[in-house]
Amino acid sequence: MSQEITKEQIAAFDADFSAQRANRVAMNAVTNNGLLASAIRREAVEQDVHEYSISLEQGEICNQKQSGRCWMFAALNTLRYQVMKKYDLKTFELSQAYLFFWDKLEKSNYFLESILDTLDEPANGRLVSYLLMAPVNDGGQWDMLCNLIEKYGVVPKTAYPESKASSGSREMDMTLTEKLREDACILRKLHKEGKGLDELRTHKTRMLGEIYRLLCICLGEPPKTFTFEYRDKDNNFHREEGLTPKSFFEKYVGVDLSDYVSLINAPTEDKPYGRSYTVQYLGNVKEGSAVRYLNLPIEELKKAAIAQMKDGQPVWFGCDVGKHSERDSGIMDLDIRGLEDLLDTRFTMTKAERLDYGQSLMTHAMVFQGVNLDENGKPNRWRVENSWGKEPGKDGYYLMTDRWFDEYMYQVVVNKKYLTAEQIAAYEAEPIALEPWDPMGSLAVVR
């Protein structure tokens, strides 16, 4: 039997609030300054110093602006590092908008194929409702980025610059979403009328042609060939004509993407360590590789990330960026705010419980560009390259404490040479398929 809130209970709550002087002080501070600003702990800001024993050089900070392309920016920032080193460049940027174009087209096909795969599922059931929720969101995963590059290559930003729709994707995404939901409705109606799969796929091809046209209008036509011109650090001018996106990747980037694997830390009962996982209905390029993770203890993620940076290579990662972080200072620290003291309450959930109860998930991808190791070789803070421009943090860089890493870091991508033979075998084993709405797939459904 349910129980309502009574007047007597409210009177008791009010008396308890009024009896504590600290409640009045907290109320005045929060109502005038806001909850999070009132809780900033000065000592945490003073202790978190942006200096690191291992610090990699990097180009100018990028800015994803009003879009959910963090995963793409982070991945391309790790790849541009190779170009800058190889060709002695002060800075360089690969076109995020170019891969954004193809990602939207591929996601549209992936969505429509998923609709064809679920024609007999109820439209208001959990699965189809989930698919319809965000057909072409901006988010993604490392493996999805690799699929795009292997199929379409990459281009420098000068060959395909940003557009209004790539820097602020909301209007385009809303239009694409409406069109794809309409397409899903049409395909399901045709199925109910008894039309066969071949006829439905004919309709799907027409639908994709319309999506392609919309993308060209919003983002511009992607280049088939282009000229690459640049100056090195010594101001020497270079030009190469007739490049294609794939030949540019092969010559100027030259990274074997198959060497890299995703490690996650998901300490929940349903995901034993030492096993590989995938997420159902998560992807973009239909014929590409499935998203795959190896679940390991958090110390293994740290060990692999540090080893890769010691070899001079940055590390792509996924985390829950909004928890215990302060945008202006760029500090990610469990002690950055004293909310428990301010509110006289306690937050006691473990990392596993936060995942199980919807309190935390992967929300943002960035790049590790350094780490500070203490006298025992243990990390105590990590240097983070963000993609929110130069204003937040220290010239666009964030600082992550090692304790924050423990609680809100979920994924790193590293070269498999930093794994043991046993770990590689576990990664390559048949993955366990997680539900589409599992928190380990959340980075790819950023909306």
Model-derived features: positions:
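Active/binding-pocket-proximal capping segment
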Residues: 321-326, 331-349, 372-375, 382-392, ...
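Catalytic nucleophile-His microenvironment captured as a short glycine-rich beta-strand/loop
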Residues: 70, 149, 356-389
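Active-site nucleophile-adjacent alpha helix/oxyanion-hole segment immediately C-terminal to the catalytic cysteine
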Residues: 47-315, 392-395, 402, 410
